[in-house]
From Swiss-Prot:
Mg(2+) binds at D19, A21, D193. The keyword Protease does not apply. One of its GO terms (molecular function) is phosphoglycolate phosphatase activity. Involved in phosphonate degradation. This is Phosphonoacetaldehyde hydrolase. Belongs to the HAD-like hydrolase superfamily. PhnX family. It is an enzyme of class 3 (hydrolase). Coiled coil: none annotated. Binds 1 Mg(2+) ion per subunit. One of its GO terms (cellular component) is cytosol.
Amino acid sequence: MSYAYQRFYRGPIEAVIFDWAGTTYDFGSMAPIRAFQNLFAEQEIPITLAEAREPMGTEKREHITRILNMPRVREAWREKYGALASEADIERLYHAFVPMQIEAIRECARPVPGLMETVAWLERRNIKIGANTGYNRDMLDVLTDIAAAQGYRPASNVCATDVPKGRPYPHMSLKNALELGVGDVRACIKVDDTLPGIEEGLAAGMWTVGVTTSGNEVGLSQEDWTALDSASKTVLREQAQERFRRGGAHVIIGSVADLPAAVEYIERWLAQGHGPDTTGLAGVTLTAAGVSLR
């Protein structure tokens, strides 16, 4: 004889695991961009905004490696230095990058509008809060100190250098879940503004929420975003939404201010016996009012 059974988690959301830059702090994820562009400018190989943003979400040494492997940058480096970038070059660049990144973090460390209201909403529902990042520990310590002084204190903070592999591997989110004491990964939501961050959450077996307006996929500072006309905002927002749909995000929101609607939507799915791996649930777009724009 053989037996098979299927378990469904039908309980509430227990934890939300946030990304940092572009999701909860630093609207537009500008600090990494400043640091990467400054780093390559010092090498006399300027990189574009698009080149700096493409690997966003990955661990920063890996981010540098991926930029160096871009065809245009690879050939520019060969022309400038007579050979392709070596492991020693990558290590040198990374050590030069760290202080640049820390300085940029200090300059850009402001909460995304709506963060504290959303945190208060989560706390009222006894939902635990964790966070992870592609920053290393020195970078993260600077950011968490600033955030704590402003009232944002995730109970678990994990950085890419704390685990064997960063995004898109699930290690950081799983470490967050362990530290938060979560009973089932299906009771967790990973919130991120990058596609590697969404892949991380999916690989961890969690629900995922993609963030468009405040994050890397739109890629504008708050001031530049505010200055756009409504038609331009719609185009950029819809382009970002489509990338998150293709990347498998379960729910897509504009910013952390919209997260309560996403949590309630996911809890309705859970009550119906659905899980993060249920076919056909990805790609729902929500507003703060909870209206589905799918």
